[in-house]
């Protein structure tokens, strides 16, 4: 463990908590390792020894033990992170990498989710368009004739992690997206007209073996490198070298970006209002005939934008903080998003789906918020839609449970 000492001038607590004991003011602090320090207020200056760098690191002995289960072993170095931010680190990563991701949880203006996840320099890219699967690795690109779902399962099995207590819920794996058109890979009876589809892949996944995780609750971060379990002694050495490089990146000073006004061009749709209304009428007909329960009808909007997506995401996370925030670049495609909805979650053998039906704008005050909530929860149409979505989610979960 490396340590550093710094001065705390009188009146400057550096995050320590004042405690009154028999009329004397003390500064009382419990560090990450359970140690306690206390100083009387008469001292003009005190010195506090802070664990600046390494809090905990996976040893070779621990790695050998974990390797017995096969797959990949998460080699972890845990650091203090009270002076590092996810956005600051992302501003460094995006300068030298074109494949990365940032996943955050911002549940309100003043509330943060516990973990933020960052990954870069993936092992491979797996994508498909119209059932043609492409596998892109650091050695090159090739087409695969295997079924996409089988291919995904095989890679997940190869890099499966053992369960290690105390680690974040995600320590490496696939990050990317599945489009709505991906349903035709799972339901053979469904086929979509390729001429009506976008140019984006039906799914696009990056496999990350290196992940940085911020723990906002403990003010620490996890540097994680997944080492293949076979030949663990050699892969452990490489993992330590990768951790050293990741630590150097985390310690790199971050310059504040230059701010400027963004300009958004005219917004256009991929369909006319007449076509939109015509298709809505067709959907209503199918519902009345009993052919479908619901339809998620969408249109694509586009506009020019003179800033990069990172600048857009910085604004998005301030103006629309949500439970699920995302920024990712998959080579030639960039995605930024914000969503409050848990579409599907798998923890152990428990599947959770929490569809959202019905919305109201946020109130300007807490009282107005409560009134809008009351109106939403007693709206007959919203309740009917909610019950329908719960029923559909139950049916979907029932197919795989």
Question: Across the structure, where does each feature detected by a protein language model lie?
Answer:
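N-terminal amphipathic/hydrophobic targeting modules at extreme N-termini
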Residues: 1-18, 23-25, 35, 44
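Short, Lys/Arg-enriched N-terminal segments with co-localized hydrophobic residues
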Residues: 40-54
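Exposed boundary/loop context
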Residues: 4-8, 15-16, 27-28, 165-169, ...
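Intrinsic-disorder-associated, low-complexity terminal segments enriched in Asp/Asn/His/Tyr and depleted
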Residues: 29-31, 36, 41
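Generic N-terminal simple sequence motifs
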Residues: 13-14, 40, 70, 82
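Amphipathic, positively biased hydrophobic alpha-helical segments used for protein targeting
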Residues: 13-14, 26, 46-49, 183-187, ...
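N-terminal hydrophobic alpha-helix used for membrane targeting or insertion
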Residues: 18-20, 30, 380
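Extended alpha-helical targeting/anchoring segments
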Residues: 52-401
